[in-house]
Each structure stands twice: as C-alpha cells, then as structure tokens.
C-alpha cells in the first residue's frame, strides 16, 4: 500500500499585475442578495442616519416603493465583488472617478458586478503596477445600479514578466449634470424637514461655505474588520497583519470606502 499523497494545488492566489490585459472583461463571482441584516449591521458600524434609508414612510412619500438601501452600503457590496479578481494582491487602492448611482437598490435586490481593464502602467521599480478598471453593477433585472472607475496598485508575482504597453485612460474631472441620474418617480413636494432634523435646503448653501461638524469618531480595527467582511472585501492588505508588518506601511490598511461612509455619517 502506497503512502504517497497525491496533492494538487487548487488554491487561487488572485491576479497579479502581469495577469491583466487591456480590454480584458472580468465577470466577478458571488452575486449578493441584500437583506435587512446587512442594513442593520451597517447602521451599527457607521451610525448612518439618512432618513431616506431609515423610514419606509418617508421614502414612500417621495415616490419610492420602500426605503432604498443606503447608497454607500450597496456600493461597498458591489465594489467587494471586484476585489478577489482586481485587488486581492493590491499594494493600495489609489483613486475613484466617474462614480454614478444609476438606480435605487432595495431590500431583496441581488447585485452582480463586472469590470473592464481600461489602463495599465507598470511602476519604475518593476515590482508592481497600476491597473485601471471600469466596473458596472446590475440588479436581478439586469438594470445598471452603479458604474465607476478605479485605479489600484497591484503587486507583480513574476518580476521577469514583460512590461505591458502603458495606457492611461482619460477620465472626467467630475460627473457632469447631464450624466447624473434622478429617479423619474421622485416627488419632493411632500418633503418635510421635521423628518431630517435639519432646516436648511439646497438653496441655503453657498459655494466655498465651510461647515465644521461637531461630532467625531475614533476608528478601531475591530469595527473596520467587521465592516470590510460585511462588504465581502477580501483584499489581503486589510486583514493580513503578518504580511503588512513586512511592508513600508507596517500595519493593516483600512478600506477607504468605509472611511467615506464614516465621514458621511458624521
């Protein structure tokens, strides 16, 4: 009887910089149906209190079927779909552009995401490079709900892999008004400031005006870790403390999208 063990390597280590190709289309795995539990946990982790996402009665008075899922929670979940293919081996996420919220997301909706590689640039040290992708998330009816561009620095695995042609996409400085989506059913005539707790409306604000919000929030690793798991974002730099101690950062990095959520909540 042989004691030989037949071991095969079926573990996916994710994509490294040299694995990406210009115009490559990636259909990301694990569609996600969003439920009440995600919404409740998101509030617990961020303190978000936007009334449209809190009260069915308010949302319905404005023309919605029910309260929509918080835009940023839905975005983080859609974004999380891209991580295993795009940025599980990231050095750091570098930026976002052309982010558009195209359709409300409701409890029970299922989100799926795909990405197209639109740019590549290897860094001068030859150890990493920047990948530009345009991602689109759709619901179960194939309606686009989000679209965005991001660029992320990704490690190389094979240092001898050939350098790809540098292609840096031309991106908009901001999303023009003509590209912003306002729901056709929106009816603001029944909007009531008593529901928001604030008295100021759109025409009360001025360009250049600065508002110093009184609240603050101390960020800790446990909250960040739980939130990033909620979004199913499995990038190693957010979780692997042993690995990150060997980098110039010296510690885990927080998912920047969660910081955006905390700032919005404050």
Describe the predicted segments one by one.
Residues 134-137, 143, 148-163:
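Flexible glycine-rich active-site/ligand-binding loops centered on an Asp-His dyad
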């Amino acid at each position: 009887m042989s004691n030989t063990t037949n071991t095969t390597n079926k573990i996916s280590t994710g994509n490294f910089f040299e694995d990406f190709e210009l115009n490559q289309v990636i259909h990301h795995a694990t569609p996600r149906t969003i439920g009440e539990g995600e919404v409740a946990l998101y509030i617990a982790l961020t303190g978000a209190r936007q009334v449209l996402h809190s009260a069915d009665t308010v949302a319905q008075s404005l023309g919605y079927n029910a309260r929509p899922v918080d835009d940023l929670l839905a975005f983080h979940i859609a974004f999380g779909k891209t991580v295993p293919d795009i940025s599980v081996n990231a050095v750091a996420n570098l930026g976002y552009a052309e982010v558009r919220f195209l359709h409300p997301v409701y409890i029970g909706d299922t989100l799926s995401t795909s990405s197209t590689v639109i740019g590549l640039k290897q860094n001068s040290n030859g150890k990493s490079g920047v990948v530009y992708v345009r991602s689109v998330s759709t619901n179960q009816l194939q309606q686009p709900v989000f679209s965005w561009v991001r660029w992320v620095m990704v490690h190389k695995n094979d240092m001898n892999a050939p350098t790809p042609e540098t292609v840096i996409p031309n991106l908009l400085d901001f999303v023009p008004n003509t590209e912003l989506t306002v729901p056709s059913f929106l009816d603001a005539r029944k909007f009531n400031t008593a529901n928001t707790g604030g008295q100021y409306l759109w025409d009360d604000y001025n360009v250049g005006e600065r508002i110093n919000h009184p609240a603050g929030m101390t960020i800790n690793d446990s909250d960040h870790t739980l939130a990033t798991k909620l979004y199913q974002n499995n990038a190693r730099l957010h979780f692997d403390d042993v690995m990150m101690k060997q980098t110039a950062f010296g510690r885990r990095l927080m998912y920047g999208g969660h910081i955006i959520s905390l700032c919005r909540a404050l």
